């Protein structure tokens, strides 16, 4: 078994546009250890989302290998890749996409039921996560009755519902004001660590990234460790 929950080895990705080929990932590599929260920093269009899509097995890279808990995925068929993604990976996006007709608790219960978790256990897990994220008094509120920060915390709980080993977050606080962003990220960080998971967080916010365990920056499709001046 690998010491890392996620490994990307020399990932290459090029998109074909009307203007020609557009390389966005040029040999990008990283390793993510259990309990580690890593910031992925770069401007819009630098390739952060493409890297997360490759890491989350949503897209196949043109070259390179993605290993999840030591399992190589390059040569697996789509069904096997989907099984790994559902079992081991959770996603948090800038826009939460909560189901509007369900309350906060139901939004966390539903993905567990889909995964085959018994209803009572799924409800208990949902209550525990939402309480840990400071939403104990908002369990039965629908998304429209929650603030933006509360909605994003529900989205974090949903991503953690099935106890993934890896959490991939794409600008998880990007649409929030600074104070709310700080509150949501603190809840995110504390909950991820309490769960024993690891997280890769894409952001253009250097201040937010500075609160993570380490930072990787994008430049010309390559990942490099950030070294403070």
Curated annotation (Swiss-Prot):
Enzyme Commission code: 7.6.2.-
Enzyme class at the top of the EC tree: translocase
Single GO term (MF): ATP binding
Binding residues for ATP: 42-49
Chain's role: Part of the ABC transporter complex LolCDE involved in the translocation of mature outer membrane-directed lipoproteins, from the inner membrane to the periplasmic chaperone, LolA. Responsible for the formation of the LolA-lipoprotein complex in an ATP-dependent manner.
Record family assignment: Belongs to the ABC transporter superfamily. Lipoprotein translocase (TC 3.A.1.125) family.
Designated name of the protein: Lipoprotein-releasing system ATP-binding protein LolD
Source species of the chain: Maricaulis maris (strain MCS10) (Caulobacter maris)
Gene giving rise to this polypeptide: lolD
